[in-house]
Structure formats: structure tokens, C-alpha cells
Amino acid sequence: MGSIDNLTEKLASQFPMNTLEPEEFRRQGHMMIDFLADYYRKVENYPVRSQVSPGYLREILPESAPYNPESLETILQDVQTKIIPGITHWQSPNFFAYFPSSGSTAGFLGEMLSTGFNVVGFNWMVSPAATELENVVTDWFGKMLQLPKSFLFSGGGGGVLQGTTCEAILCTLVAARDKNLRQHGMDNIGKLVVYCSDQTHSALQKAAKIAGIDPKNFRAIETTKSSNFQLCPKRLESAILHDLQNGLIPLYLCATVGTTSSTTVDPLPALTEVAKKYDLWVHVDAAYAGSACICPEFRQYLDGVENADSFSLNAHKWFLTTLDCCCLWVRNPSALIKSLSTYPEFLKNNASETNKVVDYKDWQIMLSRRFRALKLWFVLRSYGVGQLREFIRGHVGMAKYFEGLVNMDKRFEVVAPRLFSMVCFRIKPSAMIGKNDEDEVNEINRKLLESVNDSGRIYVSHTVLGGIYVIRFAIGGTLTDINHVSAAWKVLQDHAGALLDDTFTSNKLVEVLS
């Protein structure tokens, strides 16, 4: 026994470090909360978009990791002086560039608890609460959205929390692929065709590449301004018939509720009718706008989802849940499981073999998974359906107000209908005296975008709709209020005025010289 005791003492002396001592964790945890609270108190004062140049951080950080420990105080000082200057502040109330990554006290605290527990909930046995809470909150959320019962666990379907929409689309596409190939034969993968619009998020194209779909069989159907950039059911059916005539196999349709470029909503009832006629898997991507559909006045945009096979939205976008949390519901979980399940010996257990539990490892690409359900549960309980609806309505109201400001200024025009909390607008051709060429109008709008973003006062982004360069003004930040919207519009007006004056002066000079 003596030799074992000596070995125990020796090993104990070799590992003196306790990296999770409760009282030190408490002390440092308070420091971190204080740091973040101070950050949020002054986040509005930072330039919204980072002003650094590529490679700035490598120039100011050491070439190798420290040999000796450093204090949290020292590390946080470096965060303040070295990291924050290189952050684009997504939580700034003046961030209007992309769909929000909305945060909240409840979301942060749920994330903290999830990270603190640090469980790896790949199946029911390794953390029953992680699995069962996810079952519950996805059913809760599904009921809030009035999803068909067939998408809920209580109706034979079910929900799963993925990291992002990219993962959700890939999982459903793989499930659709394998279901089809079991019917038509594995050697027909080169004949499978995926359909979407030219407004569909690029996540689908990436998923199709990963899933082995021939790039020649990816159909991004053209949309038009006259139809508000919706996917046209007649064009979809025409594309399907053309592919069938050429011996191809229509596989998968992705319809969108709230496109990234303009937030348009594809006509789900007509599209699903066409898709079901030809036995396509239908996925509805509502990454951004899906959250709004908990409000009765927006639920209409999900009409037709009852004919879809899967549906997803990002709670981390407009639902106060913090990145990452994508909710995916499927009508037939067995389709996912057949494609994504693995059951090596070291994962076998009695609970799984009863087939009475959900093993979420078989609903996703990865094996390991985080306890995401905690933060969604915290958000749902902390704010309730009523306050969550008002949060969304507040942003929609601000967008409506901004739209009114744009319409009152004769130099600008709204380019696409505003449905939710984003406005697509531009300096219109008539504001540019003697310059009605579309390329020149696009260029002045590009310069406006660069000018306001370089100022650091606000951050906006752009898209191109039907050849028109458009500025996107997306409202959704947790800290944004009507005063920030008004101030942002003043920034845009001032910069537009300066650019138009310069353009007018340049044109006059050209006239004189000619």
C-alpha cells in the first residue's frame, strides 16, 4: 500500500491547480458581469462598425501563449484595449445592418447556466433534463406559432434546437435525399434536383453541395419586382416539368418566410400544392420572420405550413435568445433519424433501446450538443408570450415610422414593400439632376452606404433587387428605440445631401469645361 500512497501524494503534488474553485469562480464571475454591464451601458458610444485594419490584432498580441498564469484583471484590460476596438457592435442600438442577434438578460443567464452545467446531451441517458426540456420548449414554441399538431411531439412530429439554419436545412435535405434514394436507387443521386428562388438564403446552396447534389441540378428560380420577389408557383411547376421531361428527379423545395434581401414571403399554399403534386420535400425557412408569427397579425404568413415537411426559425435572431439557437420542427422525425443516426457500442444503453426516448444526436449532424433549451426556456418564462409579442411589435412600429420618414423625403424611395421590421430604400434617380442612368444611381447609393458606415455612427447594409442597389435598414436590436431610428435617418439624410451636392457640383463643372 505504501507505494500506492506515495504515488497518490506524488500525483497530487503534480496537479496543484484548481481551475474551478467555487469561491474564485464567484469572484471572477462578478467581475465578468460587471464588465459586461459596463459594456452595455456605454455600447452606444463605440463606433458601430469596427474601424480597424486587417491584421491589427496580430501586430499587438504576443507571438506565443504566456508560460505563467495571468490575472483576469489583466486579461479584461486587454479585452478593453485590444479586443473591443476590433468588434463590430451587434448589440449597439445603432446597428441596422443585418437581421438582429438579439440578446436579453434572460437569454444571457440561460446561456450562462448552460455553459456552467457544461453537459454534452447527445442522448437522453447522458442528461435526461437536457433532452426533455428541449422536447417541452419546442412544443411550447410550436403552439405559440400555431404550427400543425403533426409538427409537435404530442402529434407524432417534434422539434430540435440546431445551431443555425444552415444546419437545419442540411439535416432536412439529407433526410429528403436518402428517402428518395431508397425509392429510386442510390445510383440516382446525380439526378436529384433542388428548387428555390433567387432570393433564398445561400445556406441552401451550401447544403446542396455538402449533400452531394449536382450543382447543375440546383434551381434558383428568378423572381421579379412585379411579384415583390416572391417565388412564383407557375415558374416552379414549369421548372419541375422541364426536369421530369429530361429524366431528372425533383427532390426538395425551400420556401422562405422573410427573405434576407427584402423580407418578402413566398406564397406557401400555392407552392406546397405544386410541390406535393410532384412529391417534393418542402422546407419552410423562416429564420428571421418566423418569430413575428407568434403575433396573430403576422400568423397569416405561415398559412400553408401545414403542407410542409419541415419548418425552421432562428430564435437567436428576433427572439431574445442569443446566438446560437435555431428551432427546427419536422413532421416525420424518423426520416431524420434514418439518415443521421449512429449507434456505436460505447453509446448503447437501455433507455435508447426502449425507443421511448429522444436521442437528439440522431436529429443533427454533430454528436456533441449544447444544452440550448435552457436559454429558450428562460426567455419564454421570463417574458411570456405577451411581452415577446410587444417586443416584436415595437420593432415593426419603428420600421413603419422609418418607412414614413423615407417617403416624406422626395430624394428617397422605398424599393420593396415593408412587411416586418426592415425597410429597403435608396436615393431615387430623380434626386440626381441630369443623372438617370441606373448604374450611376446605384453608384451614388453605394457611396452613401460607405459614407455612413465609415462614420461609425450607424451601420447599414445593402442588397441588389432586380438590378437595383438597395440599402437595407433592419431594426431589431434589443436596445434600439425610436430616438435611435430618428437619429439614424438624420445621419442618412446628411450624408446623402453632401453626396448629392458634390455630384451636382461635379456635373456643373463638366458642363462648364465642355
From Swiss-Prot:
Induction (free text): Induced by fungal elicitor. Induced by methyl jasmonate.
Q: Catalyzes what?
A: L-tyrosine + O2 + H2O + H(+) = (4-hydroxyphenyl)acetaldehyde + H2O2 + NH4(+) + CO2; L-dopa + O2 + H2O + H(+) = 3,4-dihydroxyphenylacetaldehyde + H2O2 + NH4(+) + CO2
**EC number(s) from the headed UniProt entry:** 4.1.1.108, 4.1.1.107
Briefly state the protein's biological role.
Catalyzes the production of 4-hydroxyphenylacetaldehyde (HPAA) directly from L-tyrosine, tyramine not being formed as an intermediate. Catalyzes both the decarboxylation and deamination of L-dopa to 3,4-dihydroxylphenylacetaldehyde (DHPAA).
Coiled-coil blocks? none
Please state which protein family the record places this protein in: Belongs to the group II decarboxylase family.
Q: Which cofactor does it need?
A: pyridoxal 5'-phosphate
Matching entries from PANTHER family are given as:
GROUP II PYRIDOXAL-5-PHOSPHATE DECARBOXYLASE, TYROSINE DECARBOXYLASE
Q: Which gene encodes it?
A: AAS
A GO CC term attached to the entry? cytoplasm
Keywords of the record: Decarboxylase, Lyase, Pyridoxal phosphate
Q: List, alphabetically, the SUPFAM superfamilies matched.
A: PLP-dependent transferases (SSF53383)
Q: Where does L-phenylalanine bind?
A: 100, 201, 316, 346
Q: How does it assemble?
A: Homodimer.
Sites of N6-(pyridoxal phosphate)lysine modification: 317
PROSITE patterns under this entry? DDC_GAD_HDC_YDC (PS00392)
GO MF annotation: an example: pyridoxal phosphate binding
| Name of the top EC class for this enzyme | lyase
Report the biotech usage: TYDC-2 from parsley can be used in E.coli to produce 3,4-dihydroxyphenylacetaldehyde, a direct precursor of hydroxytyrosol, which is a natural compound from olive oil with a strong antioxidant activity.
Q: Name one GO biological process term.
A: amino acid metabolic process
Put simply, this protein is called 4-hydroxyphenylacetaldehyde synthase
